[in-house]
Curated annotation (Swiss-Prot):
PANTHER family for this protein: NUCLEOSIDE DIPHOSPHATE KINASE (PTHR11349)
Protein name: Nucleoside diphosphate kinase 1
Gene label: NDKP1
Binding site for ATP: 9, 57, 85, 91, 102, 112
SUPFAM superfamilies: Nucleoside diphosphate kinase, NDK
Alphabetized HAMAP family for the sequence: NDP_kinase
Organism listed in the record: Mesembryanthemum crystallinum
Protein keywords: ATP-binding, Kinase, Magnesium, Metal-binding, Nucleotide metabolism, Nucleotide-binding, Phosphoprotein, Transferase
Annotated EC: 2.7.4.6
Catalytic residue list: 115 (pros-phosphohistidine intermediate)
InterPro entries cross-referenced by the UniProt entry: NDK-like_dom, NDK-like_dom_sf, Nucleoside_diP_kinase, Nucleoside_diP_kinase_AS
GO molecular function: ATP binding; metal ion binding; nucleoside diphosphate kinase activity
Length: 148
């Protein structure tokens, strides 16, 4: 089954959106496989966002991620990467549809509440970076009510 990496950024944590965000993924039928509440240091943030290191906003992004605790999670389910991106909404909150996390809770692109893997390959890489110890192998008793 497919897995994705989701991170609630410092603004989402500070604004008390952790429960709401987890609830949206659970209500869709996805399974939480790993969760950490963590303060990220600069080298780790730089490693996570290494693919953006040449962008002009890179330093500001890293400063933002290390400014407070984040919630790092692994979610599992059929099509979870693509569907997770739809639940999250567009990177720019002003382009996000109402009903998405960013459409409902974010205004500025630099404070957009949440990160989600953009492809299965990046999810695999991000999960390995954030959860080198692995994830919890379990299945919800609701699994047969969600999947054919």
């Amino acid at each position: 089954m497919e897995q994705t990496f989701i991170m609630i950024k410092p603004d989402g944590v500070q604004r008390g959106l952790v429960g709401e965000i987890i609830s949206r993924f659970e209500k869709k039928g996805f399974s939480l496989k790993a969760l950490k509440f963590i303060n990220v240091d600069r080298p780790f943030a730089e490693k996570h966002y290494a693919d953006l290191s040449a962008k002009p906003f890179f330093n500001g992004l890293v400063e933002y991620i290390v400014s407070g605790p984040v919630v790092a999670m692994v979610w599992e389910g059929k099509g979870v990467v693509l569907t997770g991106r739809k639940i999250i909404g567009a990177t720019n909150p002003l382009a996000s549809e109402p009903g998405t996390i960013r459409g409902d809770f974010a205004i500025d692109i630099g404070r957009n509440v949440i990160h989600g893997s953009d492809a299965v390959e990046s999810a695999t890489k991000e999960i390995a970076l954030w959860f080198p110890e692995g994830v919890v192998n379990w299945q919800s008793s609701l699994h047969s009510w969600i999947y054919e």
